Amino acid sequence: MCRLCLTRRSLLAAPALAPLSHAGAAARDSPVEPGMRLADATPDRMVVAVTLDACPGDFDARIATALVESGIPATIFATDLWLRRNPAGLALLLAHRDLFDVENHGELHIPPVLGPGTIYGIPVAGDLATVRREVTAGAASISAATGMAPRWYRAATGYYSPAAMPEIERLGFGIAGYSLNADAGASLPARSVAARIARATSGEVIVAHINQPYRPSGLGVVAGIMALQRRGASFVRLDRLGATDVVPV
């Protein structure tokens, strides 16, 4: 079991992040969790983006197999740690390049947060030099593994220091937020995950995890995505989108 994925215990025990509404420098420097939706979504055209984080851990073939069998595209955010640990999983993704795009989740799964501390028990980068290494080394790993340069970066834990975000963009990466957190770090039961995904509205950028094959949440990811397909949803990959195709929320 990957200690870096969230569990119910870590969610309850983790120190609260400083509220952004507080005045002063502490609030300005508080980590933020950027939201993102698809820009061209309309009520009469159901379209969503499925994004799956491959943090340190294993390969959830239950999810990947279901996507392949149903012809549903997805964006995979992989760490260098995951790529090295899961050559068979990577091979499956590369065998279906029409469905899967592999993007940058960092080298060592270090949150791009400045200063001391942890988020959900994970030590943060601390400074911009470490942020730059995490992002660029992660990108180099993706390029070496897939032959394609990633365009998007998603932080470990999904949190960023505001001062780190323009530096990541300066390195040439879009910051991949999301609007629907489906599995809370692969910690939720299958029924809850399926219900969250099935209730998605048009334009959602969904985040779930594909690195925890021994947890029940993965079955919920499959069930929820299949429910969206039955609703007639179209699925898009982030690498097929331009800067004007997504909007912050």
Question: Can you say where each PLM-predicted feature lies in the sequence?
Answer:
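Generic recognition of short, well-ordered alpha-helical segments
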Residues: 61-62, 88, 163-166, 219-223
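Short glycine-enriched loops at secondary-structure junctions
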Residues: 53-57, 106-109
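Charged helix-capping and loop-helix junction motifs
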Residues: 190-193, 220-221
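Alpha-helix N-cap/loop-to-helix initiation residues
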Residues: 56-57, 82-83, 161, 213-217
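Metal-dependent polysaccharide deacetylase catalytic core of the NodB/CE4 family, i.e.
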Residues: 46-47, 68-191, 200-208
